[in-house]
Design a protein with these regions (language model features):
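Short basic helix-loop element that most often maps to the first helix and adjoining turn
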Residues: 18-37, 62, 90, 96
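Recognition helix of helix-turn-helix/homeodomain-like DNA-binding domains
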Residues: 39-55
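Residue-level recognition of specific faces of alpha-helices
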Residues: 19, 44-47, 73
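Core residues of bacterial helix-turn-helix
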Residues: 27, 38, 48, 66-67
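DNA major-groove recognition helix of helix-turn-helix/homeodomain DNA-binding modules
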Residues: 5, 39, 56-74
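Short, charged recognition helix plus adjacent turn
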Residues: 2, 73-115
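A short, Lys/Arg-rich alpha-helix, primarily the initiator
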Residues: 2-26
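The DNA-recognition helices of helix-turn-helix-type DNA-binding domains
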Residues: 41, 52, 67, 77-82
């Protein structure tokens, strides 16, 4: 039986950057080590932790693999942070969240190349 990857150590209400910093610091890892695992500059990772920048999907996956976390859960957290940054001041954002929650299948993209 395949081993299930661990999920996050800190609950989702914590902002992504703060959560990532807590994860890194809990393992007593310097920025440079985690940044190197994602092939990114440590200044960029620092800005991600401060909530000033976002990871790319590839960086997200690399860091999740480095920490042995579920890549889908990690990427979902990145998407939530991206949504929050892009739509924080939009009064319709909360309604959009409820629409996604109530009927997520309607908003799923289908692979057009599937047979």
């Amino acid at each position: 039986m395949a081993r299930r990857k661990r999920t996050a150590l800190i609950p989702p209400p914590v902002r992504f950057g703060a959560w990532l910093r807590e994860l890194r610091e809990a393992r007593q890892l310097p920025l440079r080590t985690v940044a190197a695992a994602a092939e990114m500059d440590q200044a960029h990772l620092s800005k991600v932790e401060l909530g000033q920048r976002l990871l790319t999907p590839n960086q997200s996956k690399a860091i999740a693999v480095f920490f042995d976390l579920d890549t889908t859960d990690f990427e979902a957290r990145r998407i939530v942070e991206k949504f929050r940054i892009e739509h924080a001041d939009n009064p319709a954002a909360e309604t959009a969240i409820h629409m996604l929650h109530d009927d997520p299948a309607v908003y799923r993209c289908k692979n057009q190349n599937a047979s």
